[in-house]
Amino acid sequence: MSLQTDIIFVAAIKSDTELLRQLAIGDVYNTAIALPDEDLDNADVPYVIVSQGEGLNDGTTKDDYEGDTDSVNITIEVAARTRAELGTLADRIRKAVRSYFRASEEGDELHDMVPLDYQFSFKPVTYDPLKPCWWMELNYQCDVRNDSTEEDDE
């Protein structure tokens, strides 16, 4: 029996407090996907990623998925004020997520997930008529590898 989990994250530029307020994530500073050596207090990280759903960010680890190969659908909804800003932000996040999937340190909650495919789609969203917000969805279909070794009964 395989398990499928859907996780949704929202990413936006950290300094754009008005946009964060419009997205209703203003003070939600929990790191949903802990990118390597990056957290929300790090001035070099230009964006925040916050959880809008439940899944592996709730404390579940790969050990809870032992057995059949399981799949996880991860959607990162990237929000920005302009299409150009959105493209730049989405590209940075894509690179960081790709790096994160390749991380192999023990203890990383998602380090055994391998992205099988991802696709992009633009959809404009307006929360305030004077401040349009562009969205890009980064969708990752992930396969959870079971790296545990089986013990021989011999």
Language-model features: locations:
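Conserved acidic
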Residues: 1, 5, 85, 132
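Small/polar-rich, solvent-exposed N-terminal microdomains that initiate assembly or binding
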Residues: 1-64, 100, 104-106, 150-154
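Short, charged, surface-exposed interaction patches
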Residues: 40-69, 111-132
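Residue-level signal for secondary-structure boundary sites
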Residues: 58, 84-86, 146-150
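Extracellular/virion structural assembly segments
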Residues: 65-67, 79-103
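Oligomerization/assembly interface segments of phage tail-like spikes and tubes
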Residues: 67-84, 132-145
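Acidic-leaning, charged glycine-interspersed low-complexity segments
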Residues: 95-154
